[in-house]
Amino acid sequence: SSKTNPDITPIMEDNTNCLFSVHISNELKNIKDKSRVLFLAQAWDEEQISQLVGLGVFRFVVDNVSDLDVLLSFLKQSENVGIKIELMLRSKLKENTMRTERHFVFGIPCETVNKKILELKNRPNISSLGIHFHRKTQNMAEWNLCYEVSNMFSEETLQAIDVLNIGGGFPSIYANTNVDVSKSVFRRINELKVFMKEKNIFLMLEPGRFIAAPAGKLITHITAIYENNIVVNASVYNTDMDALIVPVK
């Protein structure tokens, strides 16, 4: 994700072959090679799509049917018949957290994803078709990915897609368990990788937190201690920085 630390983006671009997820057009100024952009659409229009394509962006993620319809309308226009894009549909996930126990706000219901994938399978403008989802939790119980993918998406859908992007959410260190928990998480991911390889599906990850976290240090203030609990003023969390950096919520 380029939004949270744009100063690192040029370094990553020069020294790796990774892609960059981008949420708003203003962030594109940090990336020289726009073909490495994975643009996550939100309430766009055909003019914005045309501008993005003109800059060389061709990888898109849509998380609602309305934005998908706008994209398909753009591709239908006669002057755009030669445009080739790579498209991923973002699917909702149910996360069994203590706070929510509900589906994440962003994303298309998996039933609709199954239907739309089959409709889009043979579109001449779409050179690669995939599914995207993203964890917002670090709960260990949420990493049984093979089981979830098999239950969320039909066999026909899995045969139709080229790529599965499981987003991020990978832990650096869990505060409430042992530091070796990452091994269990990545064992689950390897299981999914084997499962996807059997179906000729490319597995994509977004390990930003896992890579960046060891280099950062949170300076905070302990406001209270009671029983076995410590209350801290973690201002980065309290101010909801994502909402300030990416004003689309």
Regions found by a protein language model. Give the residues of each.
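Glycine-rich beta-strand-to-loop/alpha-helix junction loops that act as flexible
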Residues: 134-136, 164-173, 207-209
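Oxyanion-binding "anion nests"
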Residues: 163-165, 184-193, 201-211
